[in-house]
Amino acid sequence: MLAAITQVLNQNSDTQVDVCMTSEMARRIELWTAMYEDNAPWVDRKKVKSAQLPAAIASEVARLVTLEMKSEITGGSSAAYLNDQYQKKVLKNIRRYVEYGCAKGGLILKPYVTKTGLAIQYVQADCFFPLAFDDSGQIQQCVFTEQFRKGQKIYTRLEVHTLQGEQIRITNRAFVATNDYSLGSEISVNAVDRWSE
């Protein structure tokens, strides 16, 4: 996935990037994902069986990390509202998402506003690629990926976030492919119902 993303983003001079993740790290995250999902490449179900240890270990670490976890948002006039949303929507299910983060090597919480309030998208390490950092190590640009299959087609959305001063510029691009080896042809984001909002 990393190579396909890099190739697509570097086709256009407006989006030239140097992905801040090595292909080796991307391969490791893919391996950790496969191991967690009980699809490790060395398991053949006949001679080599899985003990499902990656999922068990990630679950136990997440349990220990969140067992007595207390967290809240304080300060400012909007803190009470934000804390209420945070308690209901983030902390309520935090153990499950910490488990995914432990299993795959990372997790990003991406809040956004909906008609009914705040919502949180939990982006796992295999769907997030940092593109640029500042001198203090803060992410300045990244790409989030979302992918799904419908029939024989694979749809992919790249959501590039670029920090520009105090604002974030978000660019969405959509692609459709018939194989796992490339992102395929670029299509309008509005051509896909779930992304047309």
Language-model regions: role of each:
Residues M1-Q121:
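Extended, helix-rich architectural segments
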Residues Q7-N10, V98-E197:
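Structured, contiguous alpha/beta core segments that scaffold functional sites
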